[in-house]
């Protein structure tokens, strides 16, 4: 759906790279705008269907929303730079460009904070199987409020940021 046709009425959460909405309790949550640059479906190696069907096709580096549009933003970008062209992990999680991922993620953080309201919450998820989370956090000047490691070998990081009011004042 084009951004100009999408109503934000009742929408309080932006998932800026939703993929197949894997961690969502309700994959059709009416409070959320599900955005991704991909819209595709695949049959995985075990026969399961993988469907990436966002409400809005948009790149997380150039979100089509006004500043301060959402009180909650979810940012779970692709975390793999080494994955085969037909590999199931690339289909499921997306793929980073080896040359540009730092700039893309830096811009993604900036966009997340731009569309986030003052005192809003950014939920950031990263799996450091290939790229250490320390390299990712260095791409934003914002400081996390909460940081939790989960998953196999504690490689998945859930990092919560709270946007300060001063960030909005700087943008004005």
For the regions a language model picked out, list residue spans one by one.
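Class I S-adenosyl-L-methionine-dependent methyltransferase catalytic core
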Residues: 1-172
């Amino acid at each position: 759906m084009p951004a100009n046709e999408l109503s934000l009425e009742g929408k309080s959460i932006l998932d800026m790279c939703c993929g197949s909405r894997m961690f969502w309790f309700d994959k059709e949550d009416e409070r959320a705008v599900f955005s991704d640059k991909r819209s595709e479906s695949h049959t995985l190696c075990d026969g399961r269907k993988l469907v990436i069907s966002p409400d809005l096709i948009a790149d997380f580096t150039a979100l089509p929303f006004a500043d301060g549009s959402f009180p909650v933003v979810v940012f779970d970008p692709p975390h793999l730079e080494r994955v085969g062209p037909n590999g199931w992990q690339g289909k499921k999680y997306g793929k980073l460009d080896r040359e540009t991922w730092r700039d893309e993620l830096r811009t993604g953080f900036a966009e997340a904070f731009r569309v986030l309201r003052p005192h809003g919450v950014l939920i950031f998820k990263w799996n450091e199987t290939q790229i250490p989370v320390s390299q990712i956090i260095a791409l934003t000047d914002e400081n996390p409020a909460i940081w939790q490691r989960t998953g196999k070998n504690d490689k998945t990081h859930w990092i919560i940021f709270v946007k300060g009011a001063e960030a909005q004042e700087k943008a004005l």
